[in-house]
Each structure stands twice: as C-alpha cells, then as structure tokens.
Amino acid sequence: MKLPVLASAMLLAFGAMASASAQLPGPAPVAKPFVWENATVYFLLTDRFNNGNPANDKAYGRKDDAAPLRGFMGGDIAGITAKIKEGYFTDLGVNAIWLTPVIEQIHGATDEGTGKSYAFHGYWAKDFTALDAAFGTEDELRTLVDTAHANGIRIVFDVVMNHTGPVTPQDKVWPASWVRTGPTCTYKDARTTVDCTLVANLPDFLTGSDKPVDLPPHLVAKWKKEGRYEREVKELDAFFKRTGYPRAPRYYLMKWHADWVRKFGIDGFRADTVKHTEPGLWKELKKEASLALADWKRANPAKSIDQKPFWMVSEVYNYEIKHARKFDLGGGEFVDYLDQGFDSMISFSLRSDAKRPYEQVFSEYSTILHGEMKGFSVLNYISSHDDSSPFDPLRQQPFESANKLLLAPGAAQIYYGDETARILKFDGAEGDANLRTFMNWDELASNAERGMHRVADIRAHWARLGRFRAAHPAVGAGKHQMIGSSPYTFKRTWEQNGVSDRVVVALGLSTQQPVAISVGGVFSDGATVRDWYTGKTAVVKDGKVRFETAAPVALIAQD
C-alpha cells in the first residue's frame, strides 16, 4: 500500500480553503465523558501567555537586564483567567491547562552560558509554600481554578521534586542536609542520572534520604518575617503525625505540593525532571495529592468539575512511546514509570514521527496504547518549552501540525501558540529562550501573514479539530483502523463503562468539489452524520457519505 503524498497536497488545499473555512459554522459540542486518554492539554508558560495584571510586573526588585527572552515579561495568573472567560480555550477544544510553576522563584539571576537569566519559567523555586508575586495572588489563583472548572477545564500544576533554584547573591543555598551541589550528572546509568545535579549551580534535593532534617534557616527567617512561621510549623507537625513519614526532604516537598491541591482543587500534576529522582517517590506524591483532591472535592461539591481521581503525567526526558513501560536509564537499568503513580507519559516521539505518513504513525501509536500500555496513555506534542527539535520550527506546516497532533492516538499537548504559528526563533536569543517568545495575540487579532497562510485562519483549523476531539473521546482514546488510502480515511472506536463513541476522519480531500467518503461500516445506510469541520450533515448511502461542500478535512460523527 502506498499512501498519497499528503503533506504538499494538503498545504495547497488548506491555502485555498483557509479564508473561506474560517467562516464556516461548527456544531455545538455534544456532551461525552471526559477521559484523560483523550485530553487536549494546553501547555503555557505563565509569564509568556497574557498579562492580566500589569501592577505585579516588577516583583522583588528584579531588573530589566536579562539576555533576550530571559527575563520576566508580565504574563500572570490573571491573564490566563481572562482568556478562559473570553472563551479562548473552549473554542479551541481545550479541556485541561498545564501552567508552568507559579510558586515563588529565586529573586536574583544567573548565567548558565546562554546569558543572564531570571526564573520567569518557574523551575527555580525559592519557597514552595508561596506564590511568586509576579504571577499573582492566592485570590487570583482561586479565581483561575474556579473559572476553569466552571468552563469544563481542568488545571494541571507543574511540580519540581528534583532541585531548588540556582544560588545567587539574593538566594542562599539550601543546607547540606537538604541538597547536594555536585557532581554534575553524566547520564551513564541510574546513579549518574539521579545522585547528581542537572547542571552546575542547580542544587539537587536529597530525595533518596530518609534522614530527618530541620527547616532551612532561610525559610524560617522568611516565614517569620511574613508572619506565618507558626502556622506553617503547625501544619507540618500535623502532616508528619498523620503520615508517620520521617522529616526527610522529599516528604516536606510532598506536603508543600499537595497543599496547593487541597486548598485550590488542582486536578493534576505534570512532574518535572522525573528520571533525575528515585522512581518510588512519585507514587508517594500521588498518594498525598489524591487524598488532597478528595478532601477538596468533599469540601467544595459545587465547584468540583467531576469525581475523577487525581491525574499525574511524567516528564522523563527523551521518553518515546516505543519505550512503552520500559525506559532505559543506561547501564542495563530499566524503569517502568507507569508503575510509580503516573497515569501518562510525555512522549518525545511525535515531534519527529510527524515527518512520517499519517497511517504509519497512527496505527503504530494505537497498537502500543491498546497493547503494552493498555490502561495508560501518552501526552503527544509537536513543540515544547525545552525541546530544540520541534516538528515545524519555522511554522511552515501549521495545518499538517494540527492534523498530526490533534488526530494522533493519545492525549495532545498544545504548546501555547502552536495554534497561532507563534514564532520559535527570536533574533538575539540563545538556546531554549527561542521557544519561549510571548504569545502572539497581536498577530491573531490582525490576522497577520505567516508564510502562505494567515494566523486567524490557522487557528480556525486548529479549533475545528480541537472541538471535534473534545466532543469525541474516540479520537484520542479509541482504537484506530484505516478505511481507505485515497482519500486517506480512518475510523476510531471507543467504549468504556457502557458508553461508546465512533468517528470517521478523512484527510487530503479535494477542495474543488465534494468527495464521496467511505465510512467503513461505522455508520449504517440511512444514518444522518455530521461533518464537524464544515458543520454540514449528510445521509449515509451505500456505505459512503458526501457532504455538499468541499473542504480538505472531514470529521464525521453521528451527532
């Protein structure tokens, strides 16, 4: 079997259809059960998404002396909430938002070899019990979570168990009983991946130790100055009494991370730098976070989005779906992270697999997910915040990018601006800073040109696929089967707890005239089906359906 070369053909087709299709109506979403295996997770850098409160832009005396794209730029919690209220995420079919850490970051700056950098990204913690003033207040965070839940959107926090922030003149090193400051990791085996620092000047928590430790003096002094020392100590005493855990570094961290869940109703964690810690600690964290979410839901029944348990996804750098449940740390040591409390793994595969034909990718992913990984899932992406090899670095294939990401089996991670072709290269920036430009709201509003296309038209395509995906768990969670190669057509079928869902998708269709599409027995003759791409309906006849419109994609379901 030889599939047609869809990439170039669809690029031309989308170019011809974009302006017209942006105006086509889409059907209203139909309620179907949410499943994390089909989630569309919008991943954003809090500081780079939207500035909803300019009054917090100059926190802690941080200066405007950073290297290009390495300082704070104003994005905050209030900015995310504003976009939820506008309906931006709902229109895109997003049902979960993963935001970078908003806890208090180091106040100073450091240079890791790519220029002076501040902790705008959120991965350089100073105090795990407080929000960073540049990101917002607890009232603003509560409003964010409540607003998200009211709009059917879950909130995923990014958590770091591996390291503190770098040491700077303003930010002291944690005590030696808490962290190691060397050696630097060499990644040859488990020991040289875990018992080491990721880079120089990034103190590594002693997460493998069970030795009781006292609170770091700098936190004690800080909490006393802020008038909350007694409260924090009382809560810690209660935690250690309830759990029976030793007062070791990792258990303090677990308590602090779980507190955000218990207080605000956070729905899940994305775990950072997982392979650099002892695998077993994540199961312990999952237990505490699950208890915390259950407590919050009991206390806030009217605010609970559903009764699903706490969800955790793992970032094991360079994990690919083909690794399934066996990741090689080197030296003959393998780890099954899905046996350590995780429900899903971030897969680094699609950003390179997207260069392959659709059917090769879709069938391979489906086979693995419904075979070796049954009961778990992956979170696919085509670009991300620290991956220097995105699928489409120059944003020349925005429509194919959407198709490959949003139609691939598994959950989908939209990295902020994928849907608006946000640039991933900035003059003067070095390293991963290029991937972290500010969200291009101005280009979306003006419908600016991006190569052969316009930004608003690109987003309209992403939104059509996203809404279809959100309404149909079969897209990401269902079993894949090809129906035909010309045009490329496939079906996805899903069933869980007595609820079923079936869809048919066709890609690379002619934009000159309507095309008859085989539905592969998914829908019976005489059934009325809807194309979610155009909003048109048609009746199945002789196992095929023809919509009275010409669009490059058909997203077919019986609703």
Task: Report residues per predicted region.
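Short clusters of hydrophobic/aromatic residues that line enzyme substrate/ligand-binding pockets
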Residues: 128, 178, 202-205, 390, ...
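Structural recognition of the beta-strand scaffold that forms the well-ordered cores
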Residues: 40-45, 95-101, 122, 127-130, ...
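Substrate-binding/active-site clefts of carbohydrate-active enzymes
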Residues: 27, 33-39, 47-259, 263-264, ...
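Protein kinase-like catalytic domain
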Residues: 45, 149, 466-469
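Gram-negative bacterial Sec-dependent N-terminal signal peptides
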Residues: 2-21
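Active-site neighborhood of divalent metal-dependent phosphoester/pyrophosphate hydrolases
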Residues: 382-389
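Active-site-proximal helices and loops of the catalytic beta/alpha 8
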Residues: 24-25, 255-374, 378, 394-396, ...
